[in-house]
Structures are given as structure tokens and as C-alpha cells.
């Protein structure tokens, strides 16, 4: 049957990509339909119960700056918050929240069910309607045909999903859910390159069977950070600790003895797994010199006894899982509530996508999330928001948009995928961004919220809060530039107590904050120098802007220089091993890819700004011109 209502945007899948895509399109005023196989699992955390981390926390803040859902849900569900790399520079500091699965899922669902212009329908999709290389709708398992101007595919690990525990396997999208077979077959009929990837999850353990007195306790930060720019600590539920244990030689021996029963090492699994989240089998074999690996013992929520042992993802047989788990300190009597497993699934080559995440070959069809070869909730959510937004822009006959590599980690993510593709599950790290000093967590709103407002993603409440914060930051920086302090002033002794060497001459407050040993809070708290900004995020941004302005300015100059040189052609026969100063990794990647110009070279993952500068000098010095074959 044909459904009576025509939609602007249809989103297939209700995971982290799908929920952000549907919400983004609806915020823009698009008549949006979210199709999911089960409304109860909207926003479900299928693997680890955590949001954020190095590189990932930056994505969460960017999603929030564009009006997305993830940061707000993490604030409402976070049962432990930590700032990672807190002792390092602001570019690599990252927020991470241990989350209550049920609270997170409930927060996402509440947002979706109260979002204007969004309808949710529970039904599995089996077919796409494609006419003259343009998508025009979808068909569900019941034969219901929904028509739409655009369709966003966010089907995660469900396409031809195959779950492995030991040498036994069965069809499934994740534990407890069936795989999407019909849609997978239909997509393989389209002119799209496809492949197989693999991911995995550890066994879950009943906390009542763990001896926590034998484990190292890990408390969260106090005061707790917040993820959302509109967030408040009062939204956080009760905070609880995590714990740490370790594998040992006995653990490793059990695993090594049973590798012939592993689907990964017996050749049953052909898909490539995530490099930066390896299974315990992989860790034992790849790092044979290590006799121990750290395992984080993470609660799954406030109302459950289940524990997520982060670091022992596995697809070994169930009996082997029990044996190696019980070999670890504190886990001698562990009761496993769910076995760990690996899952293989179809993904589609993201090089077949435009930077808007629309297919190059089928108009109006967008891809986001693990279907593009990524791994992680945050990577999926960022893609989902951009895909949903661009679907909305297409409906309005407006030009698509994707942030540049110098604007957002989301831009780095999409550029890496659409330019280079991936042969293994792609995870975001701060090291993937050339301009990470510009792409900090604290300034995600400064970078993106104004654009989000222009695109229709940002509502009045967020825009007002952002505008007030920006005004207070600018006003405070100007005040700090204009207010002078003198070596003989009344509060000089208090000021000198903050300094390594006493003041010798007068200085502005801005000049004092530039000193490495002085921070904004302690200086402005001195009588006569305040008041301190009440907005904690604004105060943090004031200090970072002042302390790092010189570095930021130099990086912006570097960006402008590189942009001017993007079209500089590179000789097709150039042997990059002849160029002194390039690392072996950079040389190998350039010789393998043979970029046509500096712009393409700069977008190869791992090619640093320093390497690009060396290339430019070499080209100029040798007056090289690209030879055409």
C-alpha cells in the first residue's frame, strides 16, 4: 500500500546517526519520518556505556553547537564524568561520561517524541524506490510504501549482520535483534562499492559476583564537567565510581591455547576489525611482550547489576570467555550475564559519497554512521546530523554544507572518509586534525553555532545563550586589555604571590594572564581586579584565547597559506623518497596515493602541515611542473 503522506526526509535506522539525522532535518522545518525496527531501542548504546573521550568528546561538543541531541542526553545520563588529558593543553583535553544506558536512551527518545515536524514509525525497511538514479521512497517489510524527496540510510551493523561466538554464528544486527537482509540485498544491486567490517563487544558480568575490594577504584572529577553548552551539573544523576583490574599471564595462556576456536584466527571472520579497539585475542597476539592489559570495570547504570569490562572484547567460545574472565583479579567468581561476541556487517565505500554525505550515483540518497565504515557513537552521530541537515538543504534547493578541516572534527571525519575511504573501522582522534589548536572543545560553539543558526539547526534558546556568552567573552577580554596594574599598587603582594618573579613594570591584566603560571580565576579573584565571569565556560574561553592567541594566529596564517597553495600541481612521476625531511610514513603514503595537487596531498590522513611545507619548498626550488601521462 502507498502511505497517504509525502515526506521531505525519511531516515532509516534509530541509532546514534539516525536519531541525530531525523532531529536535524525536523529542526530545519522538514516533514521528517524516522523508520526504526523497534521504537524501544531508539538511541540504544549497543556496546560500551560511555560518551566522549579523546577526539570523540570534541565531536559531541560540535554536535551540541549545531543543536544536536547527544551532549544533552549524556548530561542527563552521565553517572561519572572525567576530563581526559586535563594536565595537557586545551587542544587535546576531552570530556568523557560513563552513562546509564536506560537514562541515555530515555533522554534521546524524549527529545525525539517532542520534536516538531518529526514522526516515528516502527517497521523494518526492505527496499528503496529508485527511479532514474534518484531515490523517491522506501518500502517496508509489510509492503507499505513511503514516498520522500530524500532518504538517509543509518542502518549501523544490521546489513547482513552475522554474530560470532566461537565457531558458531548466526544472523543478527546485534544481540537480540535480527539482521537487515532484504535491504542489504537491495543495496548490493545499486552501483555502490561495498565491503565487510567487523566489530565486537565483551561479555557482561553481574557486579554481585565481583570482589571490588581487590580492584583499584577510579572516581570521576569533582566538580563534574558538563557536555552541553546549555548543560548544568544539576542535570547529572547520582555519580558512582568505576574500577580497574588487569589481565595476567594465566589470562593470556588461556586465550593463546584456544585461538584455534576463535572465528578471527580460524578464518571464519573475513571482515577487518577496529585497529584502536582490538579484541583481547588481538591484544594478546599483537602485543606478545606485554604480560598484562588494563581492564576498566564500568557500571552499565544505576538500576542494574551488569558490568561492562572495557578491554576484553572477544568472540572466543563461551566456555573460554568464562575461564579467562575468572583468571583476573577480583573476577575469580564472576557470573557472566551475556557472552561477548563479534559481528560482521556490510559497509559501503564512503569515497562514493560527496562531502555532503549524499551518494555520487543516486540523487537524494544519504549515508551516515557505521554504514560508511566508522566505529563509535560519536562518529555516527556527527555524520547523522550532517546528513540530515544536507537532506533538508536539498529539499529546499539550497547548496549543501560540510565544515572544513579547519572548522570542525566533523569536517575532518567526513573529508577523511569521502577523500580517502577506509579499509578498517574509522575512529576519531585529535591527532587526525591538522589544526587541533583551533578545534578545541571549549570553542565548538564559536566555530559552529552561528552557521547552525543560519542553516536552521539552532533554536532561539541556544542562540540567545550563545550570543550572551560571546558578548561576555569579548567584553571581558577588552576589559583585561584596558586595565593596568602597577608594581606598587595595593594588591601587588597578592599578585606577586602568583608569579615566579615579582612584577618589575606595569602590565595589563591581559599581559599577566599570558604568563604560564597565572590563571584567570586566581588573578581576577584578587580584590580590585574582578569581578570574575559567572559563566564558567566563558571564563575558560577568555583564558585560553589570551594564552594561546599567538599560536592560534600563526595557525590561521598557516591555513591561509595552505589554502593559497591548494591548487599547486604535483608531478605524477615524483618519487617522494627523493625529498629530504619527509618521514617514512609520509613518503609511503604520498607514493601510494600520488596526489594530483597540494590540496589532495594535505587531505591524506597523516600528512602534516610540516610535510606540506616541505613539498611546497621542494616544488618551488625545483620549479617542477606536473607531467601528464
Curated annotation (Swiss-Prot):
Example of a GO cellular component annotation carried by this entry: cytosol
Binding site for NAD(+): 273-287
Residues that bind FAD: 13-18, 125, 180, 370
Keyword line: Cytoplasm, FAD, Flavoprotein, NAD, tRNA processing
Function: NAD-binding protein involved in the addition of a carboxymethylaminomethyl (cmnm) group at the wobble position (U34) of certain tRNAs, forming tRNA-cmnm(5)s(2)U34.
Gene Ontology BP, a term: tRNA wobble uridine modification
Species, as recorded: Psychromonas ingrahamii (strain DSM 17664 / CCUG 51855 / 37)
Name of the coding gene: mnmG
Assigned protein family: Belongs to the MnmG family.
Subunit relationships: Homodimer. Heterotetramer of two MnmE and two MnmG subunits.
Molecular-function annotations in GO: flavin adenine dinucleotide binding
Any Pfam family the entry gives: GIDA
TM region(s), chain numbering: none
Family matches, as SUPFAM superfamilies: FAD/NAD(P)-binding domain
Required co-factors: FAD
Domain of life, per lineage: Bacteria
Name of the molecule in the record: tRNA uridine 5-carboxymethylaminomethyl modification enzyme MnmG
UniProt-annotated location(s): Cytoplasm
Amino acid at each position: 500500500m502507498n502511505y497517504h503522506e509525502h515526506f521531505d526526509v525519511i531516515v532509516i535506522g534509530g541509532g546514534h546517526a539516525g536519531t541525530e539525522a531525523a532531529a536535524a532535518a525536523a529542526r530545519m522545518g522538514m516533514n521528517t519520518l524516522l523508520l526504526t525496527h523497534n521504537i524501544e531501542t531508539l538511541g540504544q548504546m549497543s556496546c560500551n556505556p560511555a560518551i566522549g573521550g579523546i577526539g570523540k568528546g570534541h565531536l559531541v561538543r560540535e554536535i551540541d553547537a549545531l543543536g544536536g541531541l547527544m551532549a544533552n542526553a549524556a548530561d542527563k545520563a552521565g553517572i561519572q564524568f572525567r576530563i581526559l588529558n586535563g594536565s595537557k593543553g586545551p587542544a587535546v583535553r576531552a570530556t568523557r561520561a560513563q552513562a546509564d544506558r536506560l537514562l541515555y536512551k530515555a533522554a534521546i527518545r524524549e527529545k525525539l517524541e517532542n520534536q516538531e515536524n518529526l514522526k516515528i514509525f516502527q517497521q523494518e525497511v526492505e527496499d528503496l524506490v529508485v527511479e532514474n538514479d534518484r531515490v523517491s521512497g522506501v518500502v517496508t517489510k509489510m509492503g507499505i510504501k513511503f514516498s520522500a524527496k530524500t532518504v538517509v540510510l543509518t542502518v549501523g551493523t544490521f546489513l547482513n549482520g552475522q554474530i560470532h561466538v566461537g565457531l558458531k554464528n548466526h544472523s543478527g544486527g546485534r544481540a537480540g535483534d535480527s539482521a537487515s537482509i532484504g535491504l542489504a540485498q537491495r543495496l548490493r544491486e545499486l552501483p555502490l562499492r561495498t565491503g565487510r567490517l567487523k566489530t565486537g563487544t565483551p561479555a557482561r558480568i553481574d557486579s554481585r559476583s565481583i570482589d571490588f575490594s581487590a580492584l583499584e577504584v577510579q572516581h570521576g572529577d569533582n566538580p563534574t564537567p558538563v557536555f552541553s553548552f546549555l548543560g548544568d551539573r544539576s542535570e547529572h544523576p547520582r555519580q558512582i565510581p568505576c574500577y580497574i583490574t588487569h589481565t595476567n599471564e594465566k589470562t593470556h595462556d588461556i586465550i593463546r591455547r584456544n585461538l584455534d576456536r576463535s572465528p578471527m584466527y580460524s578464518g571464519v571472520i573475513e571482515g577487518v576489525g577496529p585497529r584502536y579497539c582490538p579484541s583481547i585475542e588481538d591484544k594478546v597476539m599483537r602485543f606478545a611482550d606485554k604480560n598484562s592489559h588494563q581492564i576498566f570495570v564500568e557500571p552499565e547504570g544505576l538500576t542494574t547489576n551488569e558490568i561492562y569490562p572495557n578491554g576484553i572484547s572477544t568472540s572466543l567460545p563461551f566456555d573460554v570467555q568464562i575461564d579467562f574472565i575468572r583468571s583476573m583479579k577480583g573476577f575469580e567468581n564472576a557470573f557472566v550475564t551475556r557472552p561477548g561476541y563479534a559481528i560482521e556487517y556490510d559497509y559501503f565505500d564512503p569515497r562514493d559519497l560527496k562531502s555532503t554525505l549524499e551518494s555520487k550515483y543516486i540523487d537524494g540518497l544519504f549515508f551516515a554512521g557505521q554504514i560508511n565504515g566508522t566505529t563509535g557513537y560519536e562518529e555516527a552521530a556527527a555524520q547523522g546530523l550532517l546528513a540530515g541537515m544536507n537532506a533538508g538543504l536539498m529539499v529546499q534547493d539550497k547548496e549543501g554544507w560540510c565544515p572544513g578541516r579547519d572548522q570542525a572534527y566533523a569536517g575532518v571525519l567526513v573529508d577523511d572518509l569521502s577523500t580517502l575511504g577506509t579499509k578498517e573501522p574509522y575512529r576519531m582522534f585529535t591527532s587526525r586534525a591538522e589544526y587541533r589548536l583551533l578545534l578545541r572543545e571549549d570553542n565548538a560553539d564559536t566555530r559552529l553555532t552561528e552557521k547552525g543558526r543560519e542553516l536552521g539547526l539552532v533554536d532561539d534558546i541556544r542562540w540567545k545563550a550563545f550570543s550572551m556568552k560571546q558578548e561576555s567573552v569579548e567584553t571581558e577580554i577588552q576589559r583585561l586589555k584596558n586595565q593596568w596594574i602597577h608594581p606598587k599598587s595595593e594588591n601587588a603582594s597578592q599578585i606577586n604571590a602568583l608569579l615566579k618573579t615579582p612584577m618589575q613594570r606595569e602590565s595589563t591584566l591581559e599581559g599577566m594572564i599570558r604568563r604560564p603560571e597565572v590563571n584567570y580565576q586566581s588573578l581576577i579573584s584578587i580584590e580590585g581586579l574582578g569581578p570574575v565571569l559567572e559563566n564558567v565556560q566563558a571564563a575558560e574561553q577568555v583564558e585560553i584565547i589570551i594564552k594561546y592567541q599567538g599560536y592560534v594566529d600563526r595557525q590561521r596564517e598557516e591555513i591561509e597559506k595552505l589554502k593559497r597553495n591548494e591548487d599547486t600541481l604535483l608531478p605524477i612521476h615524483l618519487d617522494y623518497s627523493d625529498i629530504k625531511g619527509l618521514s617514512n610514513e609520509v613518503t609511503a603514503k604520498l607514493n601510494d596515493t600520488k596526489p594530483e595537487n597540494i590540496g589532495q596531498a594535505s587531505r591524506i590522513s597523516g600528512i602534516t602541515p610540516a610535510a606540506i611545507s616541505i613539498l611546497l619548498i621542494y616544488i618551488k626550488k625545483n620549479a617542477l611542473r606536473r607531467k601528464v601521462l
